[in-house]
Amino acid sequence: MDDSKRILITKILKNEVTEALGCTEVGLIGYAVSLCNISDPFSIEKIELTLNNGSFKNVYAVGVPNTGKYGLLPAVVGGFLGNSKNKLLIFNDITYSQELEDFTKEKLEIKVINGPLYCSVKIKDNSGKIHESLIKDNHLNVVIPEIKKEKINMEINSSEKEKYKNLELLDFLNYLDEIPEEIIKLVEKTIYTNKNLIKGDFLNYGTDILSNMVNKTTSACNIRMTGENMTAMSVAKSGNMGIMATLPIISYDFSTENNSEKLIKSVLLSMLVTIYSTYNSSYLSSMCGCVSKGGMGAVIGLSHYKNGKNLKKFDSSARTFTANLPGIICDGGKVGCALKLASGCFAAYSSLFVDISYENGIVGKNFKECVENISKISKAMGDLDCDIVEIMSKKEM
């Protein structure tokens, strides 16, 4: 493959495969609050938090690390207690304060808007000074305040995303032939980190390959959604998507060959496809990205592990997956996400053994067309978020 494509793919991977503590949108809020640089939170008179509906959904009922709490309020409080240098690991090593939560609760106003990822924090202190921050479009794109961005974390611009979207599956396969050492280390870290999330049995109903895959994947998701103080390697800014894109393949390797070279290449291919699917749609949407995007990554990764570089098998598996799960809604980050990932595991694994034809519904002719069709449906579901947020907002929590 030519150098320009290799350089682009490497940059994308370094930007889109990152470590996160807790649900990514919880980290987003905490990071945004910490950027306001409030030295004395008890001096606050008013906090205005504005979120896009997708971010609101994902924080509403999810656990916040090192707080023992769930939802928006502890995410804000944790942001006051964390160090902004930790970014999406903002809750690392914090000591939670119930007194600060009680104080903050009376000062917090929340507004939800439509649109892509958006998190604005405006804080007025008792001297009348306004402190503010704004993160938009992706979880690390800080617009306010202006900060010097580290070279390694330079965000991907729209032109680079378009170039990546124009790549073919064959380009990703060619990248596997000569993986840069830094990317091998990144994949190894991802495998190690996400394997460590497997604690206990969330959904254990057997010992066959699929049952093990479901149990390992759902157990990791459950740990993350309950707010355990354990990091996950996120893919395309989503920890659950990272879990869905990696753990089915890691489990399959454990149950079959234990081949580290095949595992690294298959997990890497899954991550590349997951990012590709995300760039074709969006980071957050009304459709469950963990299943539709992380699931498509898992499908192609599993097919690579089982069948090697067989383009016909990739297309067949993508068609079968597209005939199954796309359209499942995203109603926010929560323990129930683990069950959606269980469905994703079943759909991904069964796609290895059945070939659904192009004539079925939204099924495309090949991998690329399947991704495009799923993305089109995802974008068309945009208005659903308003109804989902309305239903969630009426709950007594």
From Swiss-Prot:
Entry EC number(s): 4.4.1.28
Annotated residues for binding of [4Fe-4S] cluster: C288, C330, C337
Top-level taxon of origin: Archaea
Cofactor comment text: Binds 1 [4Fe-4S] cluster per subunit.
Catalytic reaction equation(s): L-cysteine + H2O = hydrogen sulfide + pyruvate + NH4(+) + H(+)
Record-level GO BP terms: L-cysteine catabolic process to pyruvate
Active site, per annotation: C23
Alphabetized UniProt keyword annotations: 4Fe-4S, Iron, Iron-sulfur, Lyase, Metal-binding
Cofactor: [4Fe-4S] cluster
GO molecular-function terms, A-Z: 4 iron, 4 sulfur cluster binding; L-cysteine desulfhydrase activity; metal ion binding
Assembly behavior: Homotrimer.
Family of the protein in this entry: Belongs to the L-cysteine desulfidase family.
Protein name (record): L-cysteine desulfidase
Organism encoding this protein: Methanococcus maripaludis (strain C5 / ATCC BAA-1333)
